[in-house]
Amino acid sequence: MKNLLIIYHSQSGGTASMAEAVHRGCSQEDDVKTRFLRAFDANLDDLLWADAIIFGTPENFGYMSGALKDFFDRTFYPAEPHQINLPYGIFVSSGNDGTGAVREIDRIVKGYP
């Protein structure tokens, strides 16, 4: 069985709706166990548990949400000794094209050791 971590932040509900749809779809797979967490609730232990991660965020001022950035701030350096290099996906709720948020999430996630 594979472990999938879904981490998201939503202020207005749009990203939460998307996250719930992703979670429903992933939960239908028999060989996938999911953890579905708001960004403020996720931590290093969740990251270490995961075989793959899906990040969800609204695009705020061309960037990811502060809550998702907080998750990265809390886990990036503590993750260093664990050699985390997981497959990941990103979804963005956006009034623009969302590329700013995707670009910055990519930059951070690819930097995990």
What are these regions (language model features)?
Residues 3, 33, 87:
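Residues at the starts of beta-strands that form the adenosine-phosphate
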Residues 39-113:
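Helix-loop-strand module that forms the ligand-binding subsite of alpha/beta enzymes
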Residues 10-13, 27-32, 63-68:
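Short linear motifs at secondary-structure transitions and domain/linker junctions
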